[in-house]
Amino acid sequence: MNLGDLTNFVEKPLAAVSNIVNTPNSAGRYRPFYLRNLLDAVQGRNLNDAVKGKVVLITGGSSGIGAAAAKKIAEAGGTVVLVARTLENLENVANDIRAIRGNGGTAHVYPCDLSDMDAIAVMADQVLGDLGGVDILINNAGRSIRRSLELSYDRIHDYQRTMQLNYLGAVQLILKFIPGMRERHFGHIVNVSSVGVQTRAPRFGAYIASKAALDSLCDALQAETVHDNVRFTTVHMALVRTPMISPTTIYDKFPTLTPDQAAGVITDAIVHRPRRASSPFGQFAAVADAVNPAVMDRVRNRAFNMFGDSSAAKGSESQTDTSELDKRSETFVRATRGIHW
């Protein structure tokens, strides 16, 4: 048996285990943490108690993860504030929320370009004037770029754009809403980061750098606000099937979370207010990188060579990738379920 056969032999059982432990249940909980189900039953903790009577602002609330999370929160009794660029899409989600069985949910819409700091300030002031404050802020909006270093030499704007939306936009929202949270001695800021921050996924340098910047900032801010009962949670989200990943058509063959599963991870974080919410594989990757980064570099390099740049990243007029995954690649993808390569 050569090294390649041995690797493939190991990856197959890993793929089976990965499918089990890296897929959250309907409550947004990864299987190794199911003990929380019992604790919640004993303690009576649920989403209704966490959000009822609370104002919850969600960026990127017009589709995908944000829309799915908004509906869950509204069903549980929270007042949802939806923020995104397109008013029509926001209204569609808001109407779905208002049509919830019973008395319907409460939803407010505020269209805003979240890469424009002045526009964010104006929108935030409107929210404060209309609703008095925000109890839970979910920084979910984001821009992802998958492009190798070789194709990025003349594309500094990729780094600027991702930092503007993923980092500075979220920071502006935090700065606008956290004073009220501190005054009321309650607040929760949930940042939807990426498992890529833990795995250091190749081709995603611009994207994960912007997410890591927000992660580090909020680690520092948490130390300043613990006594104010303001909590920060970083959700290292696995790969989710949303419009954001559609330009990379090879992801059609990757196992992903659904928006509803991802929304469950967020709502579970709202209930428990952990510092970090991560998949088991993401946690393993972070520890492995700390212990032996050289080995992890080789794993990442293998993935880099296994999956090429998309047609969109190459600037091709055709947005269709013709490459197919071979059996080794398929096994590797299943073994690293939820990771964007």
Swiss-Prot record:
It is an enzyme of class 1 (oxidoreductase). Keywords: Oxidoreductase. GO terms for molecular function: oxidoreductase activity. It holds the Pfam family adh_short. Belongs to the short-chain dehydrogenases/reductases (SDR) family. The lineage of its organism: Bacteria, Bacillati, Actinomycetota, Actinomycetes, Mycobacteriales. One of its GO terms (cellular component) is membrane. It comes from the Bacteria. It comes from Mycobacterium tuberculosis (strain ATCC 25618 / H37Rv). The active site is at Y207. This is Uncharacterized oxidoreductase Rv1543. Its EC number is 1.-.-.-. Residues 309-329 are annotated as: Disordered. NADP(+) binds at residues 58-82. Signal peptide: none annotated. Substrate binds at S194.
